[in-house]
Curated annotation (Swiss-Prot):
Co-factor(s): Fe cation
Catalytic activity: a Delta(7)-sterol + 2 Fe(II)-[cytochrome b5] + O2 + 2 H(+) = a Delta(5),Delta(7)-sterol + 2 Fe(III)-[cytochrome b5] + 2 H2O; lathosterol + 2 Fe(II)-[cytochrome b5] + O2 + 2 H(+) = 7-dehydrocholesterol + 2 Fe(III)-[cytochrome b5] + 2 H2O; 5alpha-cholesta-7,24-dien-3beta-ol + 2 Fe(II)-[cytochrome b5] + O2 + 2 H(+) = 7-dehydrodesmosterol + 2 Fe(III)-[cytochrome b5] + 2 H2O
Keyword check for Nucleotidyltransferase: no
Its job: Catalyzes the penultimate step of the biosynthesis of cholesterol, the dehydrogenation of lathosterol into 7-dehydrocholesterol (7-DHC). Cholesterol is the major sterol component in mammalian membranes and a precursor for bile acid and steroid hormone synthesis. In addition to its essential role in cholesterol biosynthesis, it also indirectly regulates ferroptosis through the production of 7-DHC. By diverting the spread of damage caused by peroxyl radicals from the phospholipid components to its sterol nucleus, 7-DHC prevents this form of cell death.
InterPro entries linked: Fatty_acid_hydroxylase, Sterol_Desaturase_Related
Protein name as annotated: Lathosterol oxidase
Modified residues annotated as Phosphoserine in this record: 253
Length: 299
């Protein structure tokens, strides 16, 4: 995060915001700047990626599903907008520790004898390490003592859209992001790689809520994609993983996606629409649409 803050200081904070008497390494200034940068970055990343996904990837026919809530998209957005600033507070405390040199983040690839190999290995280890921790944290959030107050708000969205990706209770959102912050305090990681991975995991979080269940056949047994995560939203006790199915298989919580068996929400909506169309046809209303141009859905 120091790379982002350095750029923000150089181009904005130092020349336009803070007085010259307030040095860039002042801890109070750094805290304020990190809060601004973290929140601004989170909102930009969320709205940019979720909006693109919603309009160009998300299957809008899913909005006809009976478990899709009234005004759901706007509710997902409002929930996220309210939660992100609260999530940023503990997040910034960890960024501050990184910024002040308490982590194992490094600048120079040459710090390691096999620098590029180490860099590539660190990417793989980051993904597997964080996937493991997120699995157990996520599964723990389903415990009856904490689920109702902390994790249930995210499960309101049975048929999620990309905008539901960050619609968490603040404690839930921070806990599930915690593994990404723990890693650089335990293992060496290049600063640019860390920043790139941090963006990647947020984009991935959006992608597993996008309703696009296409995964190459050869990867289906290994990748925890949108189909897996949609089943998690619908059935609760399965597919807790973030990227891979490994820990769900080890923990006995893996469920083969119902969508891969023709029993998922897409199939439900398709069958429902066909039945409604046939019903209209039988009543002499074949091809007639109502209201806003869509067939009404069953209550």
């Amino acid at each position: 995060m120091d790379l982002v803050l350095s750029a923000a200081d150089y181009y904005f904070f130092t020349p336009y915001v803070y007085p010259a008497t307030w040095p860039e390494d002042n801890i109070i200034r750094q805290t304020i700047s990190l809060l601004i940068v973290t929140n601004l970055g989170a909102y930009i990343l969320y709205f940019f990626c979720a909006t693109l996904s919603y309009y160009f990837v998300y299957d809008h026919s899913l909005m006809k599903h009976p478990q899709f809530l009234k005004n759901q998209v706007s509710r997902e957005i409002v929930f996220t907008v309210k939660s992100l600033p609260w999530i940023s507070i503990p997040t910034v405390s960890l960024f501050l520790l990184e910024l002040r040199g308490y982590s194992k983040l490094y600048d120079d690839i040459g710090d390691f004898p096999n620098g590029w190999i180490h860099l590539m290995v660190s990417v793989v280890s980051f993904l597997f390490f964080t996937d493991m921790l997120i699995y157990w944290i996520h599964r723990g959030l389903h415990h009856r003592l904490v689920y109702k107050r902390i994790h249930k708000p995210h499960h309101i969205w049975k048929i999620p859209t990309p905008f539901a990706s960050h619609a968490f209770h603040p404690v839930d959102g921070f806990l599930q992001s915690l593994p990404y912050h723990i890693y650089p305090f335990v293992f060496p990681l290049h600063k640019v790689v860390y920043l790139g991975l941090y963006v990647l995991v947020n984009v991935w979080t959006i992608s597993i809520h996008d309703g696009d269940f296409r995964v190459p056949q050869i990867l289906r047994p290994f990748i925890n994609g949108s189909a897996h995560h949609t089943d998690h939203h619908m059935f609760f006790d399965y597919n807790y993983g973030q990227y891979f199915t490994l820990w769900d298989r080890i923990g006995g919580s893996f469920k083969h996606p119902s969508s891969f068996e023709g029993k998922g929400p897409h199939s439900y909506v398709k069958n429902m629409t066909e039945k409604e169309s046939n019903s209209f046809a039988e009543n002499g209303c074949k091809g007639k649409k109502v209201g806003n141009g869509e067939f009404t859905k069953n209550k």
